[in-house]
Regions:
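Short, solvent-exposed recognition patches
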Residues: 8-126
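Surface-exposed amphipathic alpha-helical segments
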Residues: 127-162
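Sec-dependent N-terminal signal peptides of Gram-positive bacterial secreted proteins and lipoproteins
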Residues: 1-5
């Protein structure tokens, strides 16, 4: 006789990552009013919103190419922004970069990582929130500073729906 095998119950930890349709939903889930970048390089739009362990809000922006994709190397490249109240590096990027520099941006100490002129990673703490921003395609330090200077507490987040 053939004996039917019982499917083994799922064993292990539930995923620490939760996807959300909007930044507002993720912020409510975390019970945080996250500071968000109001300025990004032209062409970047929200691709996804998620939380990690209810500690870190992650917003991934992706470059949407215009008419001529052959002329823009940023096509498909992402900017990963994370914010939370946990201490330490929350960027998720632990690569060693040639240059690490610390500068003040509007009175806030910011650590930049990358090359002499180009930035791949920026991290800072402001108003009790810890921030990390990773650029798949590096930006110059002035662009990174402009993004950081304009990462502020929201009055209302821009709607994003999947």
């Amino acid at each position: 006789p053939v004996v039917a095998e019982q499917a083994a119950p799922m064993v292990g930890m539930p995923s620490p990552i939760h996807e959300f349709a909007t930044i507002d939903e993720a912020a409510k889930y975390m019970n945080i009013m996250p500071h968000l970048p109001k300025v990004l390089p032209v062409g970047y739009n929200i691709e996804s919103v998620s939380t990690i362990n209810k500690d870190v809000l992650q917003v991934v922006y992706v470059y949407q190419a215009g008419e001529d994709t052959t002329r823009n190397q940023a096509a498909g490249k992402r900017i990963v922004y994370r914010v939370g109240t946990t201490k330490g590096d929350i960027s998720g990027n632990h690569k060693d970069y040639r240059v690490t520099a610390t500068e003040k941006v509007n009175g806030t100490k910011v650590t930049f990582k990358g090359g002499e002129k180009m930035v791949y990673l920026a991290g800072w703490t402001k108003d009790g929130q810890n921030h990390g921003m990773y650029f798949e395609r590096p930006v110059n330090r002035d662009m990174a500073k402009a993004i950081i200077a304009n990462t502020v507490a929201p009055t209302a987040h821009t709607a994003y729906t999947k």
